[in-house]
Amino acid sequence: MSQSNIVRLDSRSNAQAAWQTLCSRADLVANSGVVAWHDGAQVALFHLPDNADGEQLFAIENRDPKSGANVIGRGIVGSLKGELVIASPLYKQHFRLADGSCLEYPEQRLQVWPVRLIGDEVQIAAG
């Protein structure tokens, strides 16, 4: 599996990963973030139902690397330089949703997880 956390939403199997249900589709907020616990980490989930590339779901670390605060799930989703990004609500740095890299500060990076929607379940790759 690549470093990207983009998984086709109609994908039902992946021999490389074991999937764990994290929450339900009803828990998601369109074009915004919600936060869930996964293996001791806070994971911010961003659901983009009407994106130009089709419905997409991203799972990215909730902890801002500059401040140490768990606030990424409260950030603003947007597009910058052709990339889908989340802007940290504190210092306004932009992180790519696809791979967690920071556009302004290359040394900052957020962890990402493969994630998918199967029916009404949001599943995240375990391990």
Question: Where are the regions that the model predicts?
Answer:
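N-terminal pre-ligand scaffold of iron-sulfur
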Residues: 1-83, 96-97, 109-127
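Short cysteine clusters
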Residues: 64, 88-91
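Active-site loop/oxyanion-hole signature of alpha/beta-hydrolase fold enzymes
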Residues: 106
